[in-house]
Amino acid sequence: MRKKVVLSCEECKNRNYSTMKDTSSVERLEIKKFCKTCNQHTVHKETK
């Protein structure tokens, strides 16, 4: 089973991306993606 999660930028805290995540994984998703507000690649973490 997969669920929809939202990713937010660690620098500016904007919620820029949504993606699917497997429910069996316990740790939070952490991906380096482009933030259009910061205008650079930053770490994006899964939000609640």
From Swiss-Prot:
Q: Where are the transmembrane segments?
A: none
Pfam families, A to Z? Ribosomal_L33
Keywords assigned by UniProt?
Ribonucleoprotein, Ribosomal protein
Biological process, per Gene Ontology: translation
The GO terms describing molecular function are: structural constituent of ribosome
Which InterPro entries does this chain map to? Ribosomal_bL33 (IPR001705), Ribosomal_bL33_sf (IPR038584), Ribosomal_zn-bd (IPR011332)
One GO cellular component, as annotated = ribonucleoprotein complex
The answer to whether UniProt assigns keyword Ribonucleoprotein to this entry is: yes
Family indicated by similarity: Belongs to the bacterial ribosomal protein bL33 family.
Q: What is this protein called?
A: Large ribosomal subunit protein bL33A
Taxonomic lineage: Bacteria, Bacillati, Bacillota, Bacilli, Bacillales
Q: Which gene encodes it?
A: rpmG1
